[in-house]
Amino acid sequence: MYKNLKLNDKYVQKAINSEFKRQRNFIELIASENYVSDDVLKAQGSVLTNKYGEGYPYRRYYGSCENVDMVEQVAIDRLKEIFKVNYANVQPYSGSVANAAAIASVVPNGGKIMGLSLKSGGHLTHGYKISFSGIFYNSITYEVGKNGKLDYEEIKKIALAEKPDLIICGYSAYPRLIDFKKFREIADLCGAKLMADVAHIAGLIAGGVHPSPVGYAHVITSTTHKTFRGARGGVIMTNDEEIAKKVDRWVFPGYQGGPLFHAIAGKAIAFYEALQPSFKTYAENIVKNAKVFSEAFIKKGVEVVSGGTDNHLLLINVKSSYNITGKEAENFLEKINITINKNSIPFDELPPLVTSGIRLGTAAMTSRNFTKWEELAEIIDYSLRNLEFLNSKSKAARDKVKELKNRVLSFNKEFPILKKY
């Protein structure tokens, strides 16, 4: 499936094949992206996309569901095995839907939820005012400390003062380990439920390189792509039977109708891959590579938020390090075939579409067995330090940009996208 497609619809064919070319020729550093196996792609393009079946395995509202029942049940069983949980729902179309259903399962209408602010690395669905979580619930936030790390004492003070119904931990731009035990202690002190959104770190947990929230969080949500390297979608897990029943009702019929069986098949295959011994090595390499990458920038005097990383991502303050914006960094690096994303950083004074920071992740390129992290850091650092020159129209600048791009292209030839894991 990692090949050019031939379709009757030439417009869509061109877009898909152009995207395949882009993925093949670009260094992918967006922390939420990865390369799935050929098997996952095949499953998602299978005849399962034709089948409808509301409800859950072996209790559907439609007939002839025996084959999709098998697929969904094996996905459930594998996810339960990976995370060592008693209950799993693999139907959510996305992480956001999973969060919506999970929150509704443990928080009353209009109840109070408490999550990390966007600038500190939280997610829209953790209480941001324009998200469902900030519209239908009374949301409050906590922040990271001046050092860029979670301040558990400050979080406890806020929780005791505000008495939320739910505390959310697990983030989209936080580079350090999360102490789920401390969060549960805080939740118990203020009478709150604890939800862990492990969308970014699920693969690291599966590989044993990040602590698990199981045994601490009342309910756990995740996506199945990112470090999990599977089909795009969401899942919800818990060990609480009553919460499990509510989750099932909120997923269907609460938020969704028929499941996307082709996507669930892609999830099932990714879970199979995550159960193989090689996945542990993959997870270990993600973190090892992120630490090497981070240290390479630190050695060059670059401000890495929190002073480093414990997981798959790092945040760089490009405003203080290079006197540029995240938007400017993202736009230029794309010219030399490096994909990153601008990202707000703690205490950011710039708007979200501009930002003072960038976010870099190692999950995707680790899937390609990429090893030139220090050299890549050198290219990025040089580019951002010399942005004014490189964006000029001089022949010297054009030649240098071409040279940088060719170096990146050589990386992509040396480390191609793999089809099997």
From Swiss-Prot:
InterPro entries: PyrdxlP-dep_Trfase, PyrdxlP-dep_Trfase_major, PyrdxlP-dep_Trfase_small, Ser_HO-MeTrfase, Ser_HO-MeTrfase-like, Ser_HO-MeTrfase_PLP_BS, SHMT-like_dom. It comes from the Bacteria. Belongs to the SHMT family. PANTHER family: SERINE HYDROXYMETHYLTRANSFERASE, SERINE HYDROXYMETHYLTRANSFERASE 1. The gene is glyA. One of its GO terms (cellular component) is cytosol. Keywords: Amino-acid biosynthesis, Cytoplasm, One-carbon metabolism, Pyridoxal phosphate, Transferase. It is an enzyme of class 2 (transferase). This is Serine hydroxymethyltransferase.
